């Protein structure tokens, strides 16, 4: 292409900056401008990695948001970028000309013969099909697409010295009025963009004007009523051609299989049949339009012109295919959503695999491709689960009832908050309004909406999915990022599950018969709080060698390992733990062995209560404070458990531990880092036992008397109901229990979880509490104490397998 940029807007400009450069309007235009010889830079508040890479390869400089470069001569901005944006304000202050994306596009193609692809639904796919057919025919032309081809098979824009250029023309912001095409293709027309077209007639007037400005040929869908009304007015100078089932260029869908569809062509077509790597009636219409225009331009079209059509990203792209199949689609209008759900219903979500190893499919609508044949992974008639993010408040207000009607076709619906696209909220234009419409129609029983918590919505979605489901993320906002993040987590979980299937037989073949190894063992009965779900795998090794086998196999497969003692001082999530939970519950870990030097070796699985009892019988004093702690020696070592003014490491001389690599070590107390409720060396290792030093020898009756004193104090000051022990750490210089009590929280409940009326730093299970109840009560207590005293209470109990920071 020319190394010298063309003049634009009567200006000699060489340096252009793009605002919103990551969007599908500006990114291809930026690529085209760079190919024309302009020096281009761009910024965006949220880059898509694929777009960044394409622009960077083309030499477009990517700048920080709000950092308008000093040498810029012209600013081109997306209509979604408000005048208050930092870079726009800086451009205004510097007196720089600023134009919208559509204005710039019209300016750089005005010296060419323009093929404008316009309309409401399907213009990106139709444009991509036309580009594909012309490229295959080696027809000389340039193009600017409003999207990205799947697999980067073709660039989204290509400058050319040829006379012809194809461009996807958008009507949403009124810049469509700037174009004077040689050929115009209107795929269909539907009322949208109420912020710019308050009435249906306004949209019709705009397209009538576009067709009146078209010089050579017009291609219209034979099924579009608005297009028919426009042509009936007369006054058009260009020749008018229709495409569709009964149009001048006739197109019928003969067959539709996983590898694509076969079309019967008739009327003015020179071909009798065509193969299209796409699916559904809507894409048959898109293909008919593309082939008709290609033939009109003089390109040599064949039966296979679209046989290897790559499709467009975010157009019914299959993001993941396994026991749950996940799609994403750009549909953001009720008409598009109805067609999308109908197509997914019909095809049962059967995917296909392309030669690049990525999955993509379209089943009708304005959407992406089918690809090379692959076996269906799903049962017929799967459950259809939809996640929908409305796009723009104005569109939501305009179509809230229609959205509700279209979305009612889902078996399960998850609603995200509106993607504003720079708009301010308008009355009746929120997700809550769509939800209200669904309630009004009686279709809300399968709907989940968590206002202001899209992250929480994804957690609920994950728990609701079942094997065999088809899941589709729908919308034109940033829901694509949400979809990809969700799929990444889903893939990780599926990879983890495959690892478990490898772990179990490998471990069982090497473990002793005495070792217990169970799948999905319920953990609630093994805890003092009596809440929580199952462990993915639960093990009770019988010996050191068994524990080493478990750790080696888990490390080989990168599976998480968690330790469970007596189950005190922890809360297990209701969903359970996706990890290997190891308990030293076998009798071999419960040793109490007096040593010749007066010390005791206590196994990690020995209950503290039993330790005290055995020490009392042996006449060994100094362990009495441990008697009422509902734990084991291993747990007490890891947490440096304490009570009645004593701490576990007060009586420890050395610890025997096993690293997660399976190495057995003995560490003297002096070499360990121990503080309040924490032993650093045991955070990533397993205590096997410890050598304990009694304070002195004494009569058993005297020791028993001290234990009785502690027991009486405990009974009087601590609740008897199931609990995890003290919930919060004591803040410096204060008592957590006193702060909670002074906030009036004794007896406060969430579900069956209650702040104890005996000791406010205990949360008790009144019978049927869940982990969610307890977490909810922890949040409530923290908030009330913070409001009353300005103190942030930190949990002392562990959230097993998770981090408190992720839920608080």
Task: Tell where the protein language model's regions lie, with residue ranges.
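N-terminal leader/targeting and accessory segments in enzymes
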Residues: 1-104, 273, 279-281
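Active-site beta-alpha connecting loops in nucleotide-dependent enzymes
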Residues: 12-29, 40-47, 312, 344-347, ...
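Adenine nucleotide phosphate-binding catalytic loops in nucleotide-utilizing enzymes
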Residues: 14-15, 19, 78, 197-205, ...
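Phosphate-binding loop of NTP-binding sites
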Residues: 32-35, 56, 70, 79-222, ...
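Short Gly/Ser/Thr- and charged-rich N-terminal loops/segments
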Residues: 355-377
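Anion-binding (especially nucleotide phosphate/pyrophosphate-binding) glycine-rich loop
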Residues: 500-633
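Phosphate/pyrophosphate- and phosphate-bearing ligand-binding catalytic cores of soluble enzymes
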Residues: 519, 570, 658-808
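Structural signature of FAD isoalloxazine-binding scaffolds in flavoprotein oxidoreductases
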Residues: 539-544, 571-590, 638-668, 682-689
């Amino acid at each position: 292409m020319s190394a010298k940029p063309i003049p634009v807007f009567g200006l000699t400009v060489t340096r252009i900056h793009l605002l919103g450069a990551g969007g599908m309007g500006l990114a291809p235009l930026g690529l085209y401008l760079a190919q024309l010889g302009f020096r281009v830079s761009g910024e965006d508040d949220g880059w898509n990695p694929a777009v960044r890479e394409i622009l960077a390869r083309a030499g477009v400089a990517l700048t920080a948001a709000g950092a308008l470069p000093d040498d810029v001569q012209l600013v081109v901005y997306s209509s979604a970028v408000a005048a208050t944006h930092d870079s726009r304000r800086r451009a205004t202050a510097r007196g720089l000309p600023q134009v919208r994306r559509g204005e710039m596009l019209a300016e750089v193609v005005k010296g060419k013969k323009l093929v404008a692809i316009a309309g409401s639904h399907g213009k990106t796919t139709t444009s991509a099909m036309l580009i594909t057919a012309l490229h295959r025919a080696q027809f000389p032309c340039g193009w600017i697409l409003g999207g990205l081809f799947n697999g980067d098979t073709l660039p989204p824009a290509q400058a050319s010295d040829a006379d012809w250029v194809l461009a996807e023309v958008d009507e949403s912001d009124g810049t469509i009025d700037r174009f004077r095409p040689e050929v115009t293709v209107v795929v269909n027309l539907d009322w949208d963009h109420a912020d710019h077209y308050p009435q249906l007639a306004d949209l019709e007037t705009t397209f009538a004007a576009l067709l009146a400005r078209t010089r050579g040929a017009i291609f219209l869908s034979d099924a579009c009523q608005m297009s028919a009304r426009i042509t009936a007015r007369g006054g058009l100078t260009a020749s008018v051609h229709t495409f569709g089932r009964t149009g001048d260029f006739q197109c019928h869908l003969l067959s539709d299989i996983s590898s694509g569809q076969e079309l019967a062509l008739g009327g003015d077509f020179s071909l009798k049949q065509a193969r299209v790597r796409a699916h559904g009636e809507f894409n048959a219409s898109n293909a008919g339009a593309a082939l008709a225009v290609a033939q009109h331009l003089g390109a040599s079209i064949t039966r296979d012109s679209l046989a290897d059509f790559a499709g467009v990203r975010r157009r019914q792209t299959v993001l993941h295919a396994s026991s749950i199949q996940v799609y994403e689609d750009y549909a953001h209008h009720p008409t598009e959503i109805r067609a999308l759900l109908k197509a997914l219903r019909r095809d049962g979500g059967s995917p296909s695999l392309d030669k690049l190893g990525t999955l993509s499919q379209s089943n009708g609508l304005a959407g992406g491709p089918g690809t090379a044949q692959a076996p269906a992974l799903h049962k017929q008639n799967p459950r259809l689960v939809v996640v929908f993010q409305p796009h723009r408040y104005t569109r939501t207000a305009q179509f809230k009832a229609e959205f509700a009607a279209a979305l009612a076709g889902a078996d399960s619906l998850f609603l995200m908050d509106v993607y504003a696209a720079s708009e301010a909220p308008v009355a009746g234009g929120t997700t809550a309004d769509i939800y209200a419409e669904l309630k009004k129609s009686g279709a809300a029983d399968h709907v989940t909406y968590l206002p202001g918590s899209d992250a929480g919505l994804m957690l609920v979605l994950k728990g609701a999915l079942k094997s065999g489901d088809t899941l589709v993320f729908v919308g034109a906002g940033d829901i694509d990022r949400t979809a990809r993040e969700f799929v990444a987590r889903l893939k990780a979980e599926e990879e983890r599950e495959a690892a478990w299937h490898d772990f179990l037989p490998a471990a069982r073949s090497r473990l002793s018969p005495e070792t217990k190894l169970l799948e999905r063992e319920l953990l609630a009965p093994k805890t003092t709080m009596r809440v929580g779900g199952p462990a993915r795998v639960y093990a009770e090794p019988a010996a050191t060698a068994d524990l080493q086998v478990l750790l080696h196999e888990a490390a080989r497969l990168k599976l998480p390992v968690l330790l469970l003692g007596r189950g005190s001082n922890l809360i297990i999530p209701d969903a359970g733990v996706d990890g290997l939970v190891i308990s030293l519950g076998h009798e071999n870990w419960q040793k109490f062995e007096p040593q010749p030097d007066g010390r005791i070796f206590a196994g990690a699985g020995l209950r503290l209560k039993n330790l005290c009892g055995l020490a009392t019988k042996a006449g060994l004093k100094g362990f009495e404070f441990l008697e009422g702690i509902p734990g084991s020696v291993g747990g007490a070592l890891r947490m440096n458990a304490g009570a009645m003014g004593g701490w576990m490491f007060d009586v420890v001389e050395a610890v025997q531990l096993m690293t997660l690599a399976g190495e057995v070590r003995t560490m003297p107390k002096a070499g360990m880092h121990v503080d309040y409720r924490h032993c650093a060396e045991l955070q990533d290792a397993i205590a096997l036992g410890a050598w304990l030093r009694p304070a002195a020898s004494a009569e058993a009756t005297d020791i028993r008397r001290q234990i009785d004193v502690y027991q009486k104090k405990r009974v009087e000051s601590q609740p008897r109901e199931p609990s995890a022990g003290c919930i919060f750490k004591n803040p410096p210089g204060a008592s957590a229990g006193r702060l909670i009590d002074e906030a009036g929280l004794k007896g406060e409940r969430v579900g069956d979880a209650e702040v104890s009326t005996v000791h406010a730093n205990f949360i008790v299970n009144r019978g049927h509490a869940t982990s969610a109840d307890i977490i909810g009560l922890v949040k409530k207590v923290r908030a009330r104490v913070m409001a009353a005293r300005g103190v942030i209470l930190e949990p002392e109990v562990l959230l097993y397998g998770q981090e408190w920071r992720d839920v608080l």
